[in-house]
Regions:
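Short, well-ordered secondary-structure micro-motifs
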Residues: 24, 78-79
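Conserved mixed alpha/beta catalytic, RNA-binding, or beta-rich assembly cores of soluble enzyme
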Residues: 1-56, 60-61, 65-71, 89-93
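A generic structural motif
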Residues: 72-76
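Short secondary-structure subsegments characteristic of cysteine-rich extracellular domains
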Residues: 79-93
């Protein structure tokens, strides 16, 4: 996974092997704590739920607009678990 943090957004590229663009999802953080913001899949047709969930998680963790690309050979559930854990680690000091 590669993570690019900007002043107003976070880009996360979730992949195994070489970096490739995958299913692309965007999310905004919720306005209050514990509220999920708006999210949508922009491109792709594989792992729609995982890509969207990762974008929502990234937006909640970093409190910024989030764009997530997911390209993996893992199962959807396993990819969601693995990349969610990596996002949590990335935010830890």
């Amino acid at each position: 996974m590669s993570l690019l943090q900007m002043d107003n957004a976070v880009l996360a590229f979730c992949y195994d092997g070489t970096m490739k663009l995958g299913t692309l999802a965007v999310s905004t953080p919720g306005l209050t704590e514990g509220v999920v913001g708006t999210s949508s899949v922009l491109l792709g047709g594989k792992y729609l739920i995982a890509a969207r969930a990762l974008a929502e998680r990234s937006a909640a963790i970093f409190k910024k607009m989030s764009l997530v690309s997911l390209n993996t050979t893992l199962s959807e559930g396993e990819a969601l678990r693995v990349y969610s854990a990596l996002l949590d680690k990335a935010k830890s000091p």
